[in-house]
């Protein structure tokens, strides 16, 4: 989507981000895919950012654990990474350039599922992008954990369609938060709106 809306001070816009990595060890593993989406506060999609597979050598992909090797082969990300010429710095700069059209620096929390892990990787491999976000996180997985504790039936309506690619994971996270928003009263024992 092209930028059609100017950044307005009163708008509450949310930046959704997802990364695919070679594993979960922030000191050893690496970001291999990044995508972003901007929504308004009502979770309406305003813009879809660039989606990048980040170049890595075959030996780094082969060093991944079995789950990651199988998943990234199945999703097609493996081949996209091998074919890519995009480096971390290019993906970071292009993502920031996109976000600057939609959201002011520091105005949006980092939004997504298990987003603390993504923030750790960004801090190490894309620090300028990590600093673009507010220090707060909007982590959908927190609501999932709370629903599991307080109102497990809410989880029945969560449907994941993602292929474990960054962009599809973002859309799953947005859909999941929409589902929880409909059930917010249930968390506190209030009637569902």
Swiss-Prot record:
Classification via SUPFAM superfamilies: Ribonuclease H-like
GO cellular component: cytoplasm
Listed InterPro entries: Exonuclease_RNaseT/DNA_pol3, Oligoribonuclease, RNaseH-like_sf, RNaseH_sf
EC top class, as a word: hydrolase
Entries under SMART domains matching the protein: EXOIII (SM00479)
EC number annotated for this UniProt entry: 3.1.15.-
Compartments (UniProt record): Cytoplasm
Domain Exonuclease per the UniProt entry, residue ranges: 14-177
GO biological process: DNA metabolic process
Chief subcellular location: cytoplasm
Alphabetically ordered keywords of this record: Cytoplasm, Exonuclease, Hydrolase, Nuclease
An example molecular function term from Gene Ontology annotations: nucleic acid binding
Active-site residue numbers: 135
Known function: 3'-to-5' exoribonuclease specific for small oligoribonucleotides.
Family statement drawn from the similarity comment of this UniProt entry: Belongs to the oligoribonuclease family.
Protein name per Swiss-Prot or TrEMBL: Oligoribonuclease
The organism of origin for this protein: Xylella fastidiosa (strain 9a5c)
């Amino acid at each position: 989507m092209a930028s059609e809306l100017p950044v307005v001070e009163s708008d509450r816009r949310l930046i959704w981000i997802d990364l695919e990595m070679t594993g979960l060890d922030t000191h050893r593993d690496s970001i291999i895919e990044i995508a972003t989406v901007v929504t308004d506060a009502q979770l309406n999609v305003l813009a879809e950012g660039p989606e990048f597979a980040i170049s890595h050598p075959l030996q780094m992909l082969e060093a991944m654990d079995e789950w990651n090797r199988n998943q990234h082969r199945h999703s097609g990300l493996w081949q996209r990474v091998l074919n890519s010429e995009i480096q971390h710095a290019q993906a970071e700069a292009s993502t920031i350039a996109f976000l600057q059209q939609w959201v002011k620096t520091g105005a949006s929390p980092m939004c997504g599922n298990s987003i603390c892990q993504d923030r750790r990787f960004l801090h190490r491999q894309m620090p300028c992008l990590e600093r673009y976000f507010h220090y707060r996180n909007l982590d959908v997985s927190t609501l999932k954990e709370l629903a599991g504790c307080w109102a497990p039936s809410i989880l029945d309506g969560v449907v994941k369609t993602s292929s474990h690619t960054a962009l599809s994971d973002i859309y799953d996270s947005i859909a999941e938060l929409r589902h929880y928003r409909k059930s917010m009263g249930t968390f506190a024992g209030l009637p569902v709106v």
